[in-house]
Amino acid sequence: MNLINEKLDNLENNATKSPKEAVVLLNMGGPNSLYEVGVFLKNMFDDPFILTIKNNFMRKMVGKMIVNSRIEKSKKIYEKLGGKSPLTPITFALTERLNKLDPSRFYTYAMRYTPPYASMVLQDLALKEIESLVFFSMYPQYSSTTTLSSFNDAFNALKSLETFRPKVRVIERFYADKKLNEIILNTILNTLNNRKSQDFVLIFSVHGLPKSVIDAGDTYQQECEHHVSLLKELMQQKNIPFKEVLLSYQSKLGPMKWLEPSTEELIEKHRKSHIIIYPLAFTIDNSETLYELDMQYRLMAERLAIKEYLVCPCLNDSIEFAKFIIGLVKNLKSE
């Protein structure tokens, strides 16, 4: 009888035992309502990693001008997406899946420009008595404008909590992982849906950056180019030919010189071909994928009478991506 009671106690203890390690997925965020569009834009253009003006007063002034010039247009975009960004609900669904697949850790997320902010999430983790943290950048390639900005925000939030000092590890890039690239390639093939790949120009579209950011030492362009070369190698290994495989940059803002070629330019250049686009710099769908690529550029493709225009979804909350994240975390070396 004592043995049975002991086993029951062990089962109860295991069932109620809380994870001591948390994995925080870091991303830019997106408006959770039309009201939050202004909050999102204000926070983004007040970020010194985005608007690299050293003088705080000047940065805030220029940022306010940009926000005022873009807010109504941005609201119309989010109206077409159902009144909010899809990024937060998809990320929530991903963490739900992660927690079911790996109950030994607690998976959550923090956004850079909209709630839940890192400060809010870390306060909650402190109450949960978490002993170890993994900050996981949801951007496959590293950039000061995304990865570094998110890490800086998360570490500053952590420093502000004087009594919460967990062990911290980071995952700052993962584009070179073959498992990831196999998932990407499968996503492309699923989108083709038995169409002949050799009939299509495959465009890997990534978020653009001002050339000045790259000239200052940001490795983003180099990593995007390397990522495409790795995917090309994988396609050759698996004998999956495309008419052409190209890299392009989207979402240019303002009069500055940005990375080229633009996605629009490549769509127009290959107007006589079938086109399939994969959003290589994003893991979660957002306005740049669902509106810009799938609505705005689709209209452009229709005007150009392009034979066929396909847009691949991001990895989102797929079980394949969730298992990939868990694998990265489990294989992360202690520092």
Curated annotation (Swiss-Prot):
GO terms for biological process: heme biosynthetic process. Its main location: cytoplasm. Keywords: Cytoplasm, Heme biosynthesis, Iron, Lyase, Metal-binding, Porphyrin biosynthesis. Transmembrane segments: none annotated. Its EC number is 4.98.1.1. It is found in: Cytoplasm. Fe cation binds at residues 207, 288. InterPro entries: Ferrochelatase (IPR001015), Ferrochelatase_AS (IPR019772), Ferrochelatase_C (IPR033644), Ferrochelatase_N (IPR033659). NCBIfam families: hemH. This is Ferrochelatase. The lineage of its organism: Bacteria, Pseudomonadati, Campylobacterota, Epsilonproteobacteria, Campylobacterales. The gene is hemH.
